[in-house]
Amino acid sequence: MPIKPVGWICGQVLKNFSGRIEGIQKVIMDLIDEFKDEFPTILRLSQSNQKREPMQKPSKIRMAIALAKINRGTLIQGLNSISRSSKSVAKLLQPQLACRLLELRAISHRLLKEVNAPRQPLYNIQVRKGSLFEIISFPAKTALTSIMCASYAALIYLTVCVNAVLEKIMKIFQEEESIRQNREESENFRNAFSEPVLSEPLFPEGEIKAKPYRSLPEKPDSISDRPKLPANKLSNKIQVLHSVFDQSAEMNE
């Protein structure tokens, strides 16, 4: 695998992030504004887990409020692109770091062999000049390779930390979305039960007819003028009137 220089890697990273730097910078500045007051208190919290739990809840709430103000579509798209690019950078830097370590080990083995080799006679001074130059330049080479290895390791660690932060932010987004959906469902459920639904009538309006009220017949004035009936006929008339009243009462009920 050909070894790519660090400048080319940085160029590829900037090329992948071009067009999204402003949105990412805005998100980072919003997060810094939300959490800049809490950094001193977070650094002091190292005594017990009981003191840490109350501080994490408001910080999560503030993070959720800060992230809710940002456009979610662009933020999620930018986070996904950053995650993909960071993973690609980590995959690209891992073999280069291993190659540099192998080169350093080979140089150290060769130097040890040359140091432990038997001394050359005095007439072979020109051959020893090359080995002396390598001995003198070895500290510079080791320092340079160690700096490069440290920079590669720092970049890999940074990408891992960025991926962890992105995963936490995605989890917070998912929790907020689920809470919002549950709240909407509960509100819809309450509205459905608070507004009574009128059931359709069992009978159509055309078939329902009100029965006329039957009042008692008024006493005519001519009754007093009529002759009195015998007792038997009078009792029969009274029974007939009682039966009529009973039927009218049943019909009214």
From Swiss-Prot:
GO cellular component terms attached to this protein's record: membrane
GO biological process assignments: cell differentiation; spermatogenesis
Membrane topology qualifier: Single-pass membrane protein
Location in or out of the cell: Membrane
Alphabetic keyword roster: Developmental protein, Differentiation, Membrane, Spermatogenesis, Transmembrane, Transmembrane helix
Main location: membrane
Annotated TM spans: 144-166
Region (Disordered): 210-231
Residue ranges, compositional bias (Basic and acidic residues): 210-228
Pfam families on file: SPATA9 (PF15824)
Role played: May play at role in testicular development/spermatogenesis and may be an important factor in male infertility.
PANTHER family the UniProt entry points to: SPERMATOGENESIS-ASSOCIATED PROTEIN 9
Protein name: Spermatogenesis-associated protein 9
Naturally occurring in which organism (per UniProt): Bos taurus (Bovine)
Underlying gene: SPATA9
